[in-house]
């Protein structure tokens, strides 16, 4: 296992951490290193870039949704055959679940994993003041191991030298390089953040250009040197090897549905599920021998016209759920199962039609934040009076004129609310779950799939 890992932390959002992280990954890979990516927090989109540039599946590490031991194990497992791990932070270094603690922050992740930190500082229109910013971050949480700085948005090499001299004199840590303002290399954004790489097609030229830019102005070998960290010890592994498959769960996965945590898949496999992917966008049906169905989040609204035209696919999904497949649909998957998606131009696209009501897109954020979740009575995922953690992030609202059964009670910063839709074997809602927050959910789902499979066989 590699003992080199580095947290890329920003003084705030928009530094920009993601562009720099991708550039560092590309430059390290070009230098011959095997790079493993991680993303602090629940975001699905940035890891798609990490995965594309490193050619290794990037992992989310979230210290609010997951127990600290699980965070450490995820890092240790994924880093086993890597030369260096790059962990992209979220928001500002100390920003997390609430403003009064470090819970869920990049800083907390750095402490949990005992990882050195490279601080990215926006140095536009300042020189010595940059040192004051860095010193403030050092003193705010002295136990955080900030080992170096990257100066971002510098105006020239001369400007960089001023910033570097001030920081190194006052803060006693190296400034390992800089990036100039370069709008041409800014990754485009959209209502859910960065466009998933799966939609952008061929990204190799972009990665190469960004990697070369980082190589030209950042000391990559110094970065590698600073990444040396203590080995993470795992005493009682949570993740186990996949067991012999007992049920088959179909997973909708393409450009419209691609928001999944890799650990969710691994926990399902460890519990006896074989996962079979299909693409609704490409006209692929739910596999006939599937015993369960998982439709994750994504951008169905961006592909609403194409999805609306996939009549056979919609019939296939509807028939699979109606015949009893235990189904979980999260956010985009939930939207897909409604009567229709109404886009911001008031065009309505017909969807599967199993959930009575429509989803209406809007320009303003409808919901954002972590959720503590309990299931409503009859929710098979929550058998045994369990709780789970997840998050919401969407620009749409669900409207229905019919009575229906919510799937969950969720608790966020604004209090409790009922959320989602439940009907027998169908559980759907805006909430994205990390199964690592409650592995019992996985056991419940697989057991429900086994029971449904037996019931169908007995009926033959």
Swiss-Prot record:
Q: Which domain of life is it from?
A: Bacteria
Site residues (Increases nucleophilicity of active site Cys), renumbered to this chain: 432
Q: Which InterPro entries has this protein been placed in?
A: CbiA/CobB_synth (IPR004484), Class_I_gatase-like (IPR029062), CobQ/CobB/MinD/ParA_Nub-bd_dom (IPR002586), GATase_3 (IPR011698), P-loop_NTPase (IPR027417)
Instruction: Give the GO molecular function terms.
Output: ATP binding; cobyrinic acid a,c-diamide synthase activity
Tell me which Pfam families the record gives: CbiA, GATase_3
Give the GATase cobBQ-type domain ranges. 248-440
Active-site residues are 331
Which UniProt keyword terms apply here? ATP-binding, Cobalamin biosynthesis, Glutamine amidotransferase, Ligase, Magnesium, Nucleotide-binding
Q: Which reaction does this enzyme catalyse, per its entry? A: cob(II)yrinate + 2 L-glutamine + 2 ATP + 2 H2O = cob(II)yrinate a,c diamide + 2 L-glutamate + 2 ADP + 2 phosphate + 2 H(+)
Keyword Lipid metabolism in annotation:
no
Q: Would I find Magnesium among this entry's keywords? A: yes
Provide the cofactor list for this protein: Mg(2+)
Per UniProt, the enzyme's principal EC class comes to ligase
Which GO BP terms sit in this record?
A: cobalamin biosynthetic process
- NCBIfam families per record: cobB, PRK01077.1
Stated family: Belongs to the CobB/CbiA family.
Domain notes, please?
Comprises of two domains. The C-terminal domain contains the binding site for glutamine and catalyzes the hydrolysis of this substrate to glutamate and ammonia. The N-terminal domain is anticipated to bind ATP and cobyrinate and catalyzes the ultimate synthesis of the diamide product. The ammonia produced via the glutaminase domain is probably translocated to the adjacent domain via a molecular tunnel, where it reacts with an activated intermediate.
What PANTHER family does this protein map onto?
Answer: COBYRINATE A,C-DIAMIDE SYNTHASE
Q: What does this protein do?
A: Catalyzes the ATP-dependent amidation of the two carboxylate groups at positions a and c of cobyrinate, using either L-glutamine or ammonia as the nitrogen source.
Q: What extra comment accompanies this record?
A: The a and c carboxylates of cobyrinate are activated for nucleophilic attack via formation of a phosphorylated intermediate by ATP. CbiA catalyzes first the amidation of the c-carboxylate, and then that of the a-carboxylate.
Q: What is this protein called?
A: Cobyrinate a,c-diamide synthase
Species the sequence originates in: Priestia megaterium
Q: Which gene is annotated as encoding this protein in its UniProt record?
A: cbiA
